[in-house]
């Protein structure tokens, strides 16, 4: 599928004919990924969609080296040109690869390690050997980026879910990654927390230039990305801009997914002759397109065929 927004920069993550199965009790276990070929470029905001068991989280953990048992793995995963599955990777190389690709998990409580917010943010860079005054600068800058500066001296356990997740994100930012993977990072949050974290993700990509790879099953989150990849049963089913992917509503349904509600509503109207043009992925875009159609057709908004 053509992707008009894909050319962001040089390839940063390259996955070549990757297949993976988890080790079982008696050898090879369940096949999770099959012949994945994928390139993520510097500066892209990419969402990987899929139902439970599609392989999306396994793929993310392989990229970040959270999973490092390659007994039943085939193919290559290149991060910044380095093969993360190579047998000759030294420990320092593994640490550097993990620094370049930070990961934010579903439950922030599992990622927070200190009793004070700023100490938690400092934990990662301290372990990289960063000391003051640079450490202080990194912590302050990271908290400012996620809008949590005023909570620097608070206890993490007293924060809301969205605030905790932003602190976890700040801890990754302080290590200055080139890419951040968000693995279902909004799944446990209330609507306000989700909005806070999504706004932070967009800011990191649009303003800081960080490559963002978001693993989710929320279609409205995918609508705001540059690129959407749909996994089903360990294989890439669709790959394109949000609009291109959402145009394949029937294919999405076979994968246990659906288009965003606002997009479905517009598609329903289009199928009945209403002329609606433009990007139709977010509620704001759909509302603007509907209003434009109403104005253009003097309140009718119908094509000649629909009259």
Where are these regions (language model features)?
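Catalytic Walker B motif of ABC-type/P-loop ATPase nucleotide-binding domains
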Residues: 180-183
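Conserved ABC ATPase "signature" region
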Residues: 83, 133-151
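A short, flexible loop at the N-terminus of ABC-type nucleotide-binding domains that lies
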Residues: 2-15, 20-35, 67-70, 87-93, ...
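Conserved ABC ATPase signature
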Residues: 155-159, 163
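Conserved catalytic motifs of ABC-family nucleotide-binding domains
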Residues: 176
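ABC ATPase NBD Q-loop/coupling interface
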Residues: 76-96
